[in-house]
Every structure is written in structure tokens, then in C-alpha cells.
Amino acid sequence: MARKSLIQRERKRDKLEQKYHLIRRSSKKQISKVPSLSDKWEIHGKLQSPPRNSAPIRLHRRCFLTGRPRANYRDFGLSGHVLREMVHACLLPGATRSSW
């Protein structure tokens, strides 16, 4: 289980990303439309003004049960070992164990 502080930090980053999403998107569109290099540098400076944790690249997908940051399945939102345990316990409808 991940430490609770790491999970809270991830939630904080998610809120910041949602807050500054429109500002980042509009700045990136302006950069692509402006022909002169000096104007692009000005807009690039504005793009760097929001906090670093508001960048979407800083977000990390975590298991919603354990908070584990690795081996996550997007379809379920679970890490690999939790997914395996839940499938074995028949807690995920439609998911079957592979056998050949």
C-alpha cells in the first residue's frame, strides 16, 4: 500500500492540472499560430508561469485500492496483483482467467 501522503500529493496534482488546463491549451495554440519568434518566446514565458505540478506529464496513474503507481490496467484502474486477486475471487464480472 502506498503512503497516504503520496496519494494526496497525486490528488493535489490532479486538481492543479484541471485548474490550469485551459491556460496551457490556449498558450500552446497561440504558439502554433504566431509567426514571429519573439512573440513565441513571450507566449512560452506565459506557458511557464503556472506551477510545475499543473503539467499533465507530472500525473501518474495509480491503483485506486492500493495506490500502487506501477503495473496499472487502465480498463479497471487496478494494479496487476490486485486485478489478479479480484479475478480469482470472481469480483470482476466478465473477467476470466486465461487457460490453455
From Swiss-Prot:
<dbReference type="InterPro" id="IPR023036">
    <property type="entry name" value="Ribosomal_uS14_bac/plastid"/>
</dbReference>
<keyword id="KW-0689">Ribosomal protein</keyword>
<keyword id="KW-0694">RNA-binding</keyword>
<dbReference type="Pfam" id="PF00253">
    <property type="entry name" value="Ribosomal_S14"/>
</dbReference>
<keyword id="KW-0934">Plastid</keyword>
<keyword id="KW-0687">Ribonucleoprotein</keyword>
<keyword id="KW-0150">Chloroplast</keyword>
<comment type="function">
    <text>Binds 16S rRNA, required for the assembly of 30S particles.</text>
</comment>
<dbReference type="GO" id="GO:0019843">
    <property type="term" value="F:rRNA binding"/>
</dbReference>
<dbReference type="GO" id="GO:0006412">
    <property type="term" value="P:translation"/>
</dbReference>
<dbReference type="GO" id="GO:0003735">
    <property type="term" value="F:structural constituent of ribosome"/>
</dbReference>
<protein>
    <recommendedName>
        <fullName>Small ribosomal subunit protein uS14c</fullName>
    </recommendedName>
</protein>
<dbReference type="GO" id="GO:0009507">
    <property type="term" value="C:chloroplast"/>
</dbReference>
<comment type="similarity">
    <text>Belongs to the universal ribosomal protein uS14 family.</text>
</comment>
<keyword id="KW-0699">rRNA-binding</keyword>
<dbReference type="InterPro" id="IPR001209">
    <property type="entry name" value="Ribosomal_uS14"/>
</dbReference>
<dbReference type="GO" id="GO:0015935">
    <property type="term" value="C:small ribosomal subunit"/>
</dbReference>
<comment type="subunit">
    <text>Part of the 30S ribosomal subunit.</text>
</comment>
<dbReference type="InterPro" id="IPR018271">
    <property type="entry name" value="Ribosomal_uS14_CS"/>
</dbReference>
